[in-house]
Amino acid sequence: TLGEPDEKGRRKPVPLDEVETDESVAALVTTGTDKFYSNGLDLDWMGSLPESERAASGQMITDTIRLLGRLLGFPMFTVAAINGHAFAGGAMLTLAHDVRVMRTDRGFWCLPEVDLGMPFAPGMAAIVQARLTPQVAHEAVITGRRFAADEALAKAIVDAVAPETEVVRDAIALAVTQAARGRSSVGQLKRDFYDPALAIMAEGALPS
């Protein structure tokens, strides 16, 4: 998992260094707990910061964008086991994975920034555009639609759906099918394929 979530499903990701440097790890599966996969950044905390500390808020956004970019180009097969709600940065986190498996009986996938009055940072727009079709990206971003599992599957936002008890199992099974691929070739292919998006995400620029 990417760290323990709080009661609202917000989580602080652990560094990917540990995974990447462990040669025994051949694939990566992420998941959440209970009804949340991830709700992304802690907007309440960010909004509560005094003016003198607002730089920390901007740095958190930059760090998140760069994390998404690192995961998008990660040198092994990655699968998101979406066990519950995936909103905002949490939804973008799922897009950084190679494959997504979503729980059928609970949870929505959503980019709610339009309802929050929040602009997309260039790197956030880049990952959405890189991983979704133009039509689906437009619908998700401009309408803020909440996609249930079957709807997300029909739109190719996710690659598979499964009941709660089988989400992680199916995600691991998918990871196993690709685990034999060499890290160097997988990483290079991802970097080549997503180079334009990765370049934007590496900058970590804030919304204009």
Predicted feature residues:
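Acidic, divalent-metal-coordinating active-site segment for phosphoryl/phosphodiester hydrolysis
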Residues: 88, 144-151
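A short acidic, glycine-rich active-site loop
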Residues: 48-62
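Catalytic-core regions built around general acid/base machinery
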Residues: 15, 63-75
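Hydrophobic/aromatic residues within transmembrane alpha-helices
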Residues: 30, 42, 93-94, 152, ...
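Conserved CoA-thioester-binding segment of acyl-CoA-metabolizing enzymes
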Residues: 1-31
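Well-ordered beta-strand positions
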Residues: 99, 139, 143-145, 160, ...
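CoA-thioester-processing core
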Residues: 67, 71, 81, 87-140, ...
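C-terminal long alpha-helix characteristic of the crotonase
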Residues: 102-103, 107, 153-204
